[in-house]
Swiss-Prot record:
Cellular-component GO terms for this entry: cytoplasm
GO molecular function: beta-catenin binding
UniProt domain DEP: residue ranges: 421-495
Lineage of producing organism: Eukaryota, Metazoa, Chordata, Craniata, Vertebrata
Comp. bias intervals (Basic residues): 212-225, 629-646
Full protein name: Segment polarity protein dishevelled homolog DVL-3
Organism in which the protein naturally occurs: Xenopus tropicalis
InterPro entries in alphabetical order: DEP_dom, Dishevelled_C-dom, Dishevelled_fam, Dishevelled_protein_dom, DIX, DIX_dom_sf, Dsh/Dvl-rel, PDZ
Biological function: Involved in the signal transduction pathway mediated by multiple Wnt genes. Required during ciliogenesis for the docking of basal bodies to the apical plasma membrane.
Bias-annotated ranges (Polar residues): 87-98, 118-127, 199-210, 508-518
Low complexity: compositionally biased ranges: 173-189, 564-579
Renumbered residue ranges of the record's region Disordered: 87-235, 508-527, 545-652
Subcellular locations according to the entry: Cytoplasm
Length: 713
């Protein structure tokens, strides 16, 4: 003999009960169920199927009536019929006996469904009590009348275990705003007060006096309010700020091969909570339409309603519909944009908005420097609840709008704009193989960003090629250092300092040829060049060196300052003092031979080019240990000087003459002259001895065009 499982929900209790009746499912009646429960003061509502509305809760009072069965089980809701327990939205009539029986909203089926798209049964305005015209919670422009319940007109309710007022929405025709009463994480608050109306945050759309009078009336008529569950209360201000519109989109599937959406099912302890749009694939019908966005709730596909349907059933039905020919009609409840592109300039039409985590994280990262935007000065930025944009107390030197990007812009400028927090490129922490990749972005997003923000690309293929060049140049890097670009991979920004060889402090005037553009040789190890600290002028220690036979007689230089450009006099500073003394004039007279060597910088372009080629050939033949310091020597004829005077050392220091005393940075193995102090790192040298650390860093970041010759300011 078969048995029937009956799952029933009792009043406001969250956990349902299960009883087994020793009767086959096709023969079980209400009387059989009552015999097991023995609860005389309850009304019984059963899950059943209605031809017009689909799944409903039907009240059955006849003991001989057979109970509707779904998947071999009966689902029932037991509601107290004593008339003393009603929720905050129910209306107390003048006669207590006229109070309609409260209906329990319980979970387990279709939980998290906003109630405004659960149409109730058809009713007439004539049955309304006068007090329902200005309900204390429902706004005036969305009037939801009450009516007396009759068994033959079953109510279609669903929710999270609470007693709810009846309202006639007339199907989907007039109710387009979804109340967010079951969004568990945002819109609930607890209250243990006896006055149930105080559980509602009332909007200002009604007269406060009428609400107050009605509150006192209910307080007199209600001896005790039942304990309301957490999910039974909602804030009407949440409804006003998170107004979700229901839209219907008809897609023509003849033009597209696939629908192009992924769906996500939400579940909690009380059952499945709806089907949501997870992501939208490019090239599909949904992406081409553009109205459906990730985060929207899928309510209906064609004529199939997804309410009260489990996630598995909804997925199965959706697959069946997609495989059928013909247009597809999707009904969705719109959600706010989960990842706005212009999150910093998004107009705020309402004073209170839900917090956008994406905007929050990106702004916080920008302010704390998690992924710094090169070229921007620090700015104190604040976002207020009513502000429509970011206000800066310190003006930024380069905002994203200031970048005029084209295919002729250098890559550094484009990467600067791409790294800007306002660029629109989605840069955030990603998970890959359970590894967190900080500040990563997807290759396809880079291609799209380049195509839409950089002028000059004829098609997306060229933008993809440009992104590949960014990868090869090191401006973006693959997480595992792959050299081939793929739109499906995660990338991070490369170190811009590693590509500073293309930059200089000053612009070139174009008068020099390409042979003047030398690249920066490798810098020596920090310990390879000790800094003398006996004098305030900085210059390398002398080092014996035999020049290449093809070189002219070398001279000396005590230069100090940033090397800068060959054509910029202002960026060079000579170690000599213009205020000549008699002793210096005598020194100039003695060093007549070296003057000609010092003025060798006026040699023509051809001579300097050939000298560099000879030097490069000779350096390729020496060991690497010698190359590290030979590549940084100072040759007077390699510096184009616009001055007629000559560089001399600081006062009191005799100049070095001849090839054996060539100015060279000493390698690590060379010990300083007797009595010299030990070498120290630049960071530990006092500011008065290092002249200008900032100028030094600028010189390090901007290589000169003269084979690595640096002057320190």
């Amino acid at each position: 003999m078969g048995e029937t499982k009956v799952i029933y929900h009792l009043d406001e209790q969250e956990t349902p009960y299960l009883v087994k009746l020793p009767v086959p499912a096709e023969k079980v009646t209400l009387g059989d169920f009552k015999n097991v429960l023995n609860k005389p003061n309850y009304k019984f509502f059963f899950k059943s199927m209605d031809d017009d509305f689909g799944v409903v809760k039907e009240e059955i009072s006849d003991d001989n009536a057979k109970l509707p069965c779904f998947n071999g089980r009966v689902v029932c809701w037991l509601v107290s019929a004593d008339g003393s327990q009603s929720d905050a939205g129910s209306v107390c009539a003048d006669n207590q006996s006229d109070l309609p029986p409260p209906i329990e909203r319980t979970g387990g089926i279709g939980d998290s469904r906003p109630p405004s798209f659960h149409p109730n049964t058809r009713g007439s305005q004539e049955n309304l009590d006068n007090e329902t015209e200005t309900d204390s919670v429902v706004s005036a422009h969305r009037e939801r009348p009450r009516r007396k319940e009759t068994p033959e007109h079953a109510t279609r309710l669903n929710g999270t275990s609470k007693m709810e007022r009846r309202r006639d929405t007339g199907g989907y025709e007039s109710s387009s705003t979804l109340m967010s009463s079951e969004l568990d994480s945002t819109s609930f608050f607890d209250s243990d007060e006896d006055d149930s109306t105080s559980r509602f945050s009332n909007s200002t759309e009604q007269s406060s006096a009428s609400r107050l009078m009605r509150r006192h009336k209910r307080r007199r008529r209600k001896p005790k309010a039942p304990r309301i569950e957490r999910s039974s209360s909602f804030s009407s201000i949440t409804d006003s700020t998170m107004s979700l519109n229901i839209i219907t989109v008809t897609l023509n599937m003849e033009k597209y091969n696939f629908l192009g959406i992924s769906i996500v099912g939400q579940s909690n302890e009380r059952g499945d909570g709806g089907i949501y749009i997870g992501s939208i694939m490019k090239g599909g019908a949904v992406a081409a339409d553009g109205r459906i966005e990730p985060g929207d709730m899928l309510l209906q596909v064609n004529d199939t309603n997804f309410e009260n349907m489990s996630n598995d059933d909804a997925v199965r039905v959706l697959r069946e519909i997609v495989h059928k020919p013909g247009p597809i009609t999707l009904t969705v409840a719109k959600c706010w944009d989960p990842s706005p592109r212009n999150c910093f300039t998004l107009p705020r039409s309402e004073p209170i908005r839900p917090i956008d985590p994406a905007a929050w994280v990106s702004h916080t990262a920008a302010m704390t420097g998690s992924y710094p935007a090169y070229g921007m000065s620090p700015s104190m930025s604040t976002i207020t609840s009513t502000s429509s944009s970011i206000t800066s107390s310190i003006p930024e030197t380069e905002r994203f709008d200031d970048f005029q990007l084209s295919i002729h812009s250098d890559m550094v400028t484009i990467v600067k704009a791409m790294r800007s927090p306002e660029s629109g490129l989605e840069v955030r922490d990603r998970m890959w193989l359970k590894i967190t990749i900080p500040n990563a972005f997807i290759g396809s997003d880079v291609v799209d960003w380049l195509y839409h923000h950089v002028e000059g690309f004829t098609d997306r293929r060229e933008a993809r090629k440009y992104a590949s060049n960014l990868l090869k140049a090191g401006y973006i890097r693959h997480t595992v250092n792959k050299i081939t670009f793929s739109e499906q991979c995660y990338y991070i920004f490369g170190d811009l300092c590693g590509n500073m060889a293309n930059l200089s402090l000053n612009d070139h005037d174009g008068s020099s040829g390409t042979s003047d553009q030398d690249t920066l040789a490798p810098l020596p190890h920090p310990g390879a060049a000790p800094w003398p600290i006996a004098f305030q002028y900085q210059y390398p220690l002398p080092h014996p060196y035999s020049p290449h036979p093809g070189f002219p007689d070398p001279a000396y230089s005590y230069g100090g300052g940033s090397a800068g450009s060959q054509h910029s006099e202002g960026s060079r500073s000579s170690g000599s003092n213009r205020s000549s003394t008699e002793k210096r004039k005598e020194r100039e007279a003695k060093g007549g031979d070296t003057k000609s060597g010092g003025s060798g910088s006026e040699s023509d372009h051809t001579t300097r080019s050939s000298v560099r080629r000879e030097r490069a050939a000779s350096e390729r033949s020496v060991p690497a240990s010698e190359h590290s310091h030979r590549s940084h020597h100072s040759i007077a004829h390699s510096i184009r000087s616009h001055h007629t005077h000559h560089s001399f050392g600081p006062p009191g220091i005799p100049p070095l003459y001849g090839a054996p005393m060539m100015m060279m940075p000493a390698p690590a193995s060379v010990i300083g002259p007797p009595g010299a102090p030990p070498s120290r790192d630049l960071a530990s040298v006092p500011p008065e001895l290092t002249a200008s650390r900032q100028s030094f860093r600028m010189a390090m970041g901007n290589p000169t065009k003269n084979s690595g010759v640096f002057d320190f300011l």
